Amino acid sequence: MVEADHPGKLFIGGLNRETNEKMLKAVFGKHGPISEVLLIKDRTSKSRGFAFITFENPADAKNAAKDMNGKSLHGKAIKVEQAKKPSFQSGGRRRPPASSRNRSPSGSLRSARGSRGGTRGWLPSHEGHLDDGGYTPDLKMSYSRGLIPVKRGPSSRSGGPPPKKSAPSAVARSNSWMGSQGPMSQRRENYGVPPRRATISSWRNDRMSTRHDGYATNDGNHPSCQETRDYAPPSRGYAYRDNGHSNRDEHSSRGYRNHRSSRETRDYAPPSRGHAYRDYGHSRRDESYSRGYRNRRSSRETREYAPPSRGHGYRDYGHSRRHESYSRGYRNHPSSRETRDYAPPHRDYAYRDYGHSSWDEHSSRGYSYHDGYGEALGRDHSEHLSGSSYRDALQRYGTSHGAPPARGPRMSYGGSTCHAYSNTRDRYGRSWESYSSCGDFHYCDREHVCRKDQRNPPSLGRVLPDPREACGSSSYVASIVDGGESRSEKGDSSRY
């Protein structure tokens, strides 16, 4: 190729736009034979005002440069110089001349590409002295696109126009924005999606475990209440019945907030409704935690046991206190799938054991002591009758009796329990002093005067009658001692 370090190549700048290759060859051919004339054109094939002429003899090129430089051609003074290879193509990197910065690189690149490639790499020997157009930069930029960032970088560092200066600052701003967004996004991650997942997984694990920690609090530890829309009518019924004598938090916790697992309870809402009408008329504020919604560890297995629980509730829970029903087939079983064969014995036992317990006794037993007797309840009720879980709970509250038998000794235990919880009951503004007349209960007043019911203790068969018969046979509901005011209520089958 001729352009590879060819000393006979001249650069002619400042040409008239009307000058073409033939005119250039005719003018410069006087100094010697010309091998190539290259007129740089734009996309529209119009002259850009400069050209390259290659002489066969380098001496002729030198003579032509000396002779033609500064002369007028077609009405314009031209510049003729020795063309040089760009410094970046010969291994080094040089900044383009000052006048070259005002030229558009894209046009020169495309026009050079459209022309012959033989003279593409040549530049004039004297850089920075082109008066009318600065063609050298166009050639430089046409030879290599890679120099465009290099050309732009120094101009921004040396105080170029504001738009060029703003580019690095924009990048810096974007980097700073990204940096600032990083911690914010991390903080969002800490408070957003994962906690929810963690919450879901944690409450699911809670639901299937044997721990009843969540039951001890009143602040809604049960995050899954969104599936309870099918159970709103039963809970509405509870609120109607139970809020008559309950404190402020009873209604808010009922059926909406305090469910451990409510998505499987739609089959059990009617049994719990029956319980609510009979049992919780005088219950206290947290009583509704046990209403068929919250107090089931796993209610998907209690399908067969809800009706026995209903009948049992009319007999046994009719006059129990506020957390008494937590142990009745719903709440006190960490896994109710074990209660399949033991529901009637458990019914009898819960009836006898919780008959005279008060608010704190039930809350401790219903919440924290489920681990002890809940599983024993599912495994063996004879062992449960003589187990120590109830004994520990009762002794902790001032009772000195052991596990309750089915008959006589239970009465003294109940009496002492009534006496032990008089202060706790007074905190809530009312006491629960009398109990069911189903046969095995006795009722105590605040002075812990306990007397046994006149009837003989019924057998297991009599303790567990038909649900409607049981509902009608309970006569004593409660004798509430509240600042000297007492009221009693008769339970009949019309509440069923």
Curated annotation (Swiss-Prot):
Pfam family, one: RRM_1
SMART domains associated with the record: RRM
An example molecular function term from Gene Ontology annotations: RNA binding
Tissues in which the UniProt entry reports expression: Testis-specific.
GN (gene name): RBMY1A1
General remark: The RBMY1 proteins are encoded by repeated regions of the Y chromosome, mostly within the AZFb region. The exact number of functional copies is unclear and may vary between individuals, and some of them may represent pseudogenes. The proteins are very similar, which makes the characterization of each protein difficult. Thus, most experiments do not discriminate between the different members. One can therefore suppose that reported interactions with a RBMY1 protein involve all the proteins.
Oligomer and partners: Interacts with splicing factor proteins SFRS3/SRP20, TRA2B/SFRS10, KHDRBS1/SAM68 and KHDRBS3.
One GO BP: mRNA processing
Domain of life per record: Eukaryota
Keyword Nucleus: yes
Basic and acidic residues composition bias: residue spans: 204-214, 242-253, 276-289, 313-326, 335-349, 484-496
Region (Disordered): 78-349, 452-496
Protein name (database record): RNA-binding motif protein, Y chromosome, family 1 member A1
The protein's role, per its UniProt record: RNA-binding protein involved in pre-mRNA splicing. Required for sperm development. Acts additively with TRA2B to promote exon 7 inclusion of the survival motor neuron SMN. Binds non-specifically to mRNAs.
Low complexity bias: start-end ranges: 97-114, 149-159
Domain RRM: 8-85
Keywords: Activator, mRNA processing, mRNA splicing, Nucleus, RNA-binding
Cleavable signal peptide: none
PANTHER family listed in its UniProt record: TRANSFORMER-2 SEX-DETERMINING PROTEIN-RELATED (PTHR48034)
Protein localization: Nucleus
Biased composition annotated in UniProt, kind: Polar residues: 175-184
Recorded GO CC terms: nucleolus; nucleoplasm; spliceosomal complex
